[in-house]
């Protein structure tokens, strides 16, 4: 019985890793609350808060399944004395099975006013990804399998990205390529190899509509595309609808094509502190083997300007 369970466990982890690195959907960490975490994929988003801001996010994908992806994210953005310039920082730890990726990227964003109430930000992102894989941690049936003989392997890959973000108080459109350079991690053994980073194109849009004195509706759409031969899913779409009650409570739902659906809740404290929770449920065969995906986000803003804030940020 134990041997059978070990085989099932090993096959399960192998299936997760294979799916994660053979399809475009998992080449970079995915987020359900992407509309408040845009900076990780679009450097032009830095500066849109118009204040010093911090965000932390933890995502436990396919909860209850050994070796499933776990992602921890920290971002910050800060305007400079030159009000048109803002800087950002993104630090991400992503683990799938025995494989780990650690991302550190800095952002530069420049503001171009295009109208009385509309702004365009252009951004540049630069940094690196460090990949590591500890072959000795594998619980395998054959300890002499040459594919799993070795110690910790590492690979370091620098990269850069570009982005644009057009926005007003209640609407936005963004486009970005967070990693321009296609690269491989060049970690291979007799029976297994790891793909590196593929170039992805992101297009996003959202708007806020007043439905009443204390009720607003925000639909958003998010598209991720990769046109390389290595990508298993060339195009993926996210659709989200959120309702805002009394400028404090967000409640909504999301759908990701070919992957999952879920629900989102966020609460705003004093317009500076935002706490959000999201849960996803897989629509693939993996739904039978996990308890959903859980995501918690906390963001905080330090506002130094004296003018009164009329309403909170909508994205």
Residue ranges, per PLM feature:
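Bacterial N-terminal signal peptides that target proteins for export
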Residues: 1-12
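Bacterial N-terminal signal peptides
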Residues: 10-20
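Subset of outer-membrane beta-barrel
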Residues: 26-315
């Amino acid at each position: 019985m134990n041997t059978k369970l070990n085989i099932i466990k090993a096959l399960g982890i192998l299936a997760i890793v294979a799916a994660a690195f053979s399809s475009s959907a998992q080449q970079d960490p995915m987020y359900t609350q992407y509309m408040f975490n845009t900076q990780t994929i679009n450097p032009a988003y830095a500066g849109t808060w118009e204040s010093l801001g911090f965000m932390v996010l933890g995502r436990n994908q396919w909860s209850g399944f050994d070796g499933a992806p776990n992602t921890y994210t920290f971002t910050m953005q800060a305007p400079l004395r030159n009000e048109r310039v803002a800087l950002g920082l993104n630090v991400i730890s992503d683990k799938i099975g025995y494989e780990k990726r650690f991302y550190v990227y800095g952002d530069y964003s420049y503001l171009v006013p295009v109208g009385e109430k509309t702004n365009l930000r252009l951004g540049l992102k630069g940094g690196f990804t460090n990949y590591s894989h500890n072959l000795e941690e594998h619980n395998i049936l054959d300890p002499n399998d040459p594919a799993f003989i070795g110690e910790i392997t590492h690979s370091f890959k620098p990269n850069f990205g570009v982005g644009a973000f057009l926005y007003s108080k209640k609407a936005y459109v963004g486009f970005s390529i967070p990693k321009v350079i296609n690269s491989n991690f060049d970690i291979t053994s007799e029976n297994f190899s790891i793909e590196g980073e593929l170039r992805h194109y992101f297009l996003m849009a959202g708007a806020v509509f007043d439905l009443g004195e204390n009720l607003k509706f925000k639909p958003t759409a998010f598209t991720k595309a990769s046109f390389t031969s290595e990508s298993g899913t060339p195009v993926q779409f996210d659709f989200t609808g959120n309702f805002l009650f009394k400028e404090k409570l967000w409640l909504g739902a999301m759908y990701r094509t070919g992957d999952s659906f879920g629900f989102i809740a966020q609460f705003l404290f004093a317009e500076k502190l935002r706490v959000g929770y999201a849960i996803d449920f897989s629509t693939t065969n993996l739904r039978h083997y996990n308890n959903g995906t859980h995501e918690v986000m906390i963001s905080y803003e330090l506002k130094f300007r004296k003018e009164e804030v009329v309403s909170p940020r909508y994205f």
